[in-house]
């Protein structure tokens, strides 16, 4: 187990949020990714399944950027595309040989598109909007041009935000994503429901589509492999139907996320792939105590217990003023 950081932060203003900043145990990863990296879980899961790997020197380079060419590689590995089959088939004029099979495969599958004038723009850094659109298409969204309305970025960001694709990612639509953020985005997609188009494609009158209505419905299935990722809704009214998440479909139930507890008996979950443990990670959504009214020092003392207070250091803020004393 990695060195444990003994820190616990409290934040108080109109509300108070409490969480112990100690990560759960995980398998060996990269030398530049440790407990302090909020994307450690995503990076290690994607390493285990072979979607994103590190540099030759053993680093993951979490803060490094990722290009559109490299994002095509990520998508090809994510979707297990036979990229060699598509070698030499892409329609773009600016794709280097090393990236050509991946870009070609993704273009053939409708996952990526060019930037105009026969160019793919592969050397450009991939933005949050671009990367999320690729992943949304993998989930089943935006299969028709009409889905975008008048602005593809607005439509993409709106729908991606609605399904929580940007959880744990601090970025805006046109910002270049870091490698760590891309890893988080992909992991979020793996835990998202796949969908089918159930809207109305309308009728074509000249160059105009009339009556088009974009609607998507979550896919369901009865196979137990569709109940291997724990991330909210799974069973539909006890009818044996499970919402199909991307990671369940792609990995045939071999990628698993199960409720667990860490070494401190805190609520956590453990990831595994093909029966091999990837790591155990604290479920931070349950490591929160929120107060919407005034809270006394005694209440905090009773919540934390005297042993915890003796063992850990505390910092909390009341209306912006820092204190470390709990009485």
Role assignments for model-derived ranges:
Residues 43-52:
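Mature N-terminal segment immediately following signal peptide/propeptide cleavage
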Residues 277-327:
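Structural detector for short beta-strands of small beta-barrel domains
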Residues 179:
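Extracellular structured ligand-interaction cores
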Residues 2-40, 53-69, 75-101, 108-129, ...:
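Feature responds to low-complexity, polar/acidic, surface-exposed segments characteristic
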């Amino acid at each position: 187990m990695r060195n444990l950081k003994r820190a616990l932060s409290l934040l108080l203003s109109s509300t108070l949020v409490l969480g112990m900043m100690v990560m759960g145990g995980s398998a060996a990863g990269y030398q530049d990714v440790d407990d302090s990296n909020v994307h450690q879980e995503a990076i290690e899961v994607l390493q285990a399944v072979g979607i994103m790997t590190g540099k030759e020197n053993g680093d993951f380079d979490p803060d490094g950027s990722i290009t559109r060419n490299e994002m095509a590689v990520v998508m090809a590995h994510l979707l297990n595309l036979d990229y060699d089959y598509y070698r030499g088939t892409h329609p773009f004029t600016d794709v280097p040989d090393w990236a050509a099979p991946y870009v070609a495969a993704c273009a053939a599958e409708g996952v990526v598109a060019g930037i105009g004038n026969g160019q793919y723009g592969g050397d450009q850094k991939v933005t949050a909007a671009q990367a999320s659109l690729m992943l949304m298409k993998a989930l089943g969204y935006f299969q028709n041009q009409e889905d975008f309305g008048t602005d593809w970025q607005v439509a993409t960001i709106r729908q991606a935000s609605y399904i929580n694709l940007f959880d744990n990612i601090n970025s805006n639509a046109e910002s270049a994503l870091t490698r760590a953020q891309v890893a988080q985005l992909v992991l979020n997609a793996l835990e998202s429901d796949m969908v089918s188009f159930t809207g109305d494609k309308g009728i074509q009158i000249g160059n105009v589509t009339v009556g088009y209505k974009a609607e998507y419905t979550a896919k369901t299935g009865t196979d137990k492999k569709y109940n291997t990722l724990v991330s909210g809704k799974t069973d539909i009214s006890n009818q044996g139907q499970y919402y199909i998440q991307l990671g369940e479909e792609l990995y045939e139930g071999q990628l698993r996320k199960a409720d667990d507890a860490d070494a401190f008996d805190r609520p956590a979950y453990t990831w595994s792939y093909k029966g091999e443990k990837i790591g155990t990670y604290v479920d931070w959504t349950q490591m929160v105590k929120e107060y919407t009214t005034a809270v006394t020092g005694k209440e905090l003392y009773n919540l934390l217990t005297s042993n915890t207070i003796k063992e850990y250091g505390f910092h909390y803020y009341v209306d912006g003023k820092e204190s470390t004393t709990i009485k």
